[in-house]
Amino acid sequence: MYLAVEIGTVDLNPVLKGAVATILYFAVGMAVLLVGFYAVDLLTPGKLRQLVFIDRRPNAVVVAGAMYIALTVVIITAIANSYSQLGQGLVGVAVYGLMGVILLGVALLAMHLLIPGSFHEHVEEPQLHPGSFAVALILLAVGGVTAAAVS
């Protein structure tokens, strides 16, 4: 007795196209995140890598982490709403992602001006400062609003 299962033909073309699209969206997303990292580095006192990874400043971690979460939400939303054509979708993700970097940068600059005391001192403090959570929530709100505006 034969027990055979008919598999049919397998078309890998859509899978390969999807894999290539995933790699390209990843590359664009990482490029936007790198631009975001350097923007945060420019807008916060000291070298961000040193403050986070060497000096272990908790306020720098909170602010930088919120910035990356907010920017990631914008990138994910841009990818989810991207155009059906890959080229247009990649350009859209890059444009919306960079808009997110700019808007989050504007929010950080506004907080520099509006936060009482020295924003720079808060970020560099070795003890966790409650103000860093307020800054983080504002950044998350800006990222959420920017993501919602992505069409």
Curated annotation (Swiss-Prot):
Cross-referenced InterPro entries: DUF350
Lineage top rank: taxon: Bacteria
This protein's record includes keyword Membrane: yes
A Pfam family annotated for this UniProt entry: DUF350
Official protein name in the record: UPF0719 transmembrane protein MAP_1032c
Keyword Transmembrane listed: yes
Main location: membrane
Location of this chain's protein in the cell: Cell membrane
Assigned protein family: Belongs to the UPF0719 family.
Record keywords, A-Z: Cell membrane, Membrane, Transmembrane, Transmembrane helix
Membrane topology listed for this record: Multi-pass membrane protein
Regions crossing the membrane: 20-40, 60-80, 90-110, 130-150
Cellular component GO terms, alphabetical: plasma membrane
